[in-house]
């Protein structure tokens, strides 16, 4: 192949020189006759440019098939201006060079073959450079393949990548996960003897104020979490547990209200449990900074803060439920008993509650019912005002009604006290005032039922009622 390429290059160069020799005189005459026109190629190119252009045209005319076949040859560059040397001399030189190379490589061929035999065939390099080119990323190779072949190649590539990844993972060692490379860039820290810098403090001799100061400096969130734990446990015990009992007994029907109470109850319990775990870490002197419990506490606190908006809206209803439970129990929670103001029999109490929960108007939580009960007086007042206005509009053309003064017709009757209207109450009040006056005039007899045990109201040591002698 090398000989053929050299012959082809020599022949082309000889043809160009022959053409250049034949046309040199003609071109000189043309140049002397008239200058080249701008449309002529000689106006822009010389002989060397024309040679390269003709060569590129010939290559394009032959097509890419011959170019690809030429790439399969050994990586020998084709000479542009080769020397016109006989082929026999070239063959002799090549044979001598091959013999010299063979003599040089005989010593290392055995060692190289042994090294190649010890390598896994799947990890060894190929023998030809062309195997590593013309991948499936180009449009040319994909165009001649079907969709099924392309998918098969992609699947094989994926499997091969997984095999390589598993092999690399198995090759990892413990040193690969260390931070030795970071320690190399770290600044050397001067080592100080702990016995010289450590100050031993006797906490028994430290005052409470100093202890609190040290505690706030070390972990400022500890005291706040303790106070928050006390508040949340008190709220769970006094408010949420009674309401959860009402939900379990069916007094508060299932709905959004009961779901809200259960959510808040579980949220508070989880928050208190995480605070308790944090306190255990502090008691065991375990560093809590960066511990997952800190992130968990922040999450629960954010959720509790989101519930504060709903707590403000339902605070009055919750207080009403708690007072009703502490006072009259389930009887006060029965809406039909409040509307009719009658005392149903105890045997029918459960039936009434069951009917109320089954009716569609009581599908919502009991909290909404008490909200309606609070709004009832205002609705009644508005209804009365509307009825009064309607009555006034209807009686605009009627006669004017008499006033209270005309209806009573008291005239010049003197004003009397209200107590004079009822003689029994009047004499009772008169007797009460007489007893008070009698107690101030005559001392009541107090018989000695037991021995003297001192003044009942106590003796004031600072009081002096004696008169000094003059």
Swiss-Prot record:
Entry-annotated residues carrying Citrulline: 376
Gene that specifies this protein: Utp3
GO BP term (any one): chromatin organization
Amino acid composition bias (Basic residues), ranges on this chain: 413-440
Function: Essential for gene silencing: has a role in the structure of silenced chromatin. Plays a role in the developing brain. Part of the small subunit (SSU) processome, first precursor of the small eukaryotic ribosomal subunit. During the assembly of the SSU processome in the nucleolus, many ribosome biogenesis factors, an RNA chaperone and ribosomal proteins associate with the nascent pre-rRNA and work in concert to generate RNA folding, modifications, rearrangements and cleavage as well as targeted degradation of pre-ribosomal RNA by the RNA exosome.
N6-acetyllysine modification, residue list: 140
Keyword Ribosomal protein annotated: no
Protein name: Something about silencing protein 10
Segments of skewed composition (Acidic residues): 68-107, 149-161
Naturally occurring in which organism (per UniProt): Rattus norvegicus
Compartment list: Nucleus, Nucleolus
Glycyl lysine isopeptide (Lys-Gly) (interchain with G-Cter in SUMO2) cross-link, chain position(s): 140
Presence of the UniProt keyword Cytoplasm in the record: no
PTM sites of type Phosphoserine: 37, 146
Keywords per UniProt: Acetylation, Chromatin regulator, Citrullination, Developmental protein, Isopeptide bond, Methylation, Nucleus, Phosphoprotein, Ubl conjugation
Principal subcellular localisation of the protein: nucleus
């Amino acid at each position: 192949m090398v000989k053929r390429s050299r012959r082809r290059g020599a022949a082309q160069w000889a043809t160009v020189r022959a053409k250049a020799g034949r046309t040199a005189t003609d071109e000189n005459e043309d140049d002397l006759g008239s200058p080249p026109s701008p449309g002529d190629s000689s106006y822009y190119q010389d002989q060397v440019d024309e040679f390269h252009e003709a060569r590129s045209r010939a290559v394009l005319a032959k097509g890419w098939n011959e170019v690809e076949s030429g790439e399969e040859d050994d990586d020998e560059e084709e000479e542009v201006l080769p020397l016109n040397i006989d082929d026999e001399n070239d063959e002799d030189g090549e044979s001598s060079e091959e013999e010299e190379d063979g003599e040089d490589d005989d010593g290392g061929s055995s060692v190289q073959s042994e090294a190649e035999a010890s390598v896994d065939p799947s990890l060894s390099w190929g023998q030809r450079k062309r195997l590593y080119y013309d991948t499936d990323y180009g449009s040319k190779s994909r165009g001649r393949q079907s969709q099924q072949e392309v998918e098969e190649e992609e699947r094989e590539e994926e499997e091969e990548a997984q095999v390589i990844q598993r092999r690399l993972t198995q090759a990892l060692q413990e040193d690969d996960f260390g931070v030795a490379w970071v320690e190399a860039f770290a600044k050397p820290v001067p080592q100080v003897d702990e016995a010289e810098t450590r100050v031993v403090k006797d906490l028994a001799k430290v005052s409470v104020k100093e202890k609190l100061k040290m505690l706030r400096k070390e972990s400022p969130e500890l005291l706040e979490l303790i106070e928050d734990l006390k508040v949340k446990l008190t709220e769970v015990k006094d408010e949420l547990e009674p309401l959860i009992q009402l939900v379990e007994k069916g007094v508060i029907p299932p709905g959004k209200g009961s779901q809200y109470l259960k959510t808040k109850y579980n949220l508070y319990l989880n928050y208190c449990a995480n605070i308790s775990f944090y306190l255990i870490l502090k008691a065991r002197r375990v560093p809590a900074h960066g511990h997952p419990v800190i992130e968990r506490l922040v999450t629960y606190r954010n959720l509790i803060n989101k519930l504060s908006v709903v707590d403000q809206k339902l605070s009055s209803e919750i207080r009403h439920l708690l007072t009703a439970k502490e006072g009259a129990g389930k009887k006060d929670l029965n809406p039909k008993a409040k509307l009719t103001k009658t005392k149903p029999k105890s045997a029918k109490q459960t039936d009434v509650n069951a009917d109320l929960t089954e009716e569609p108007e009581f599908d919502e939580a009991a909290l909404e019912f008490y909200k309606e009960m609070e709004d009832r007086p205002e609705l009644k007042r508005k209804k009365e005002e509307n009825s009064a206005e309607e009555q006034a509009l209807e009686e605009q053309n009627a006669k004017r009604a008499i006033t209270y003064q005309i209806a009573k017709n008291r005239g010049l009757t003197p004003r009397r006290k209200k107590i004079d209207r009822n003689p029994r109450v009047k004499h009772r009040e008169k007797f009460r005032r007489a007893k008070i006056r009698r107690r101030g005039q005559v001392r009541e007899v107090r018989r000695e039922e037991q021995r003297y045990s001192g003044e009942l109201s106590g003796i004031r040591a600072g009081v002096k009622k004696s008169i000094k002698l003059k």
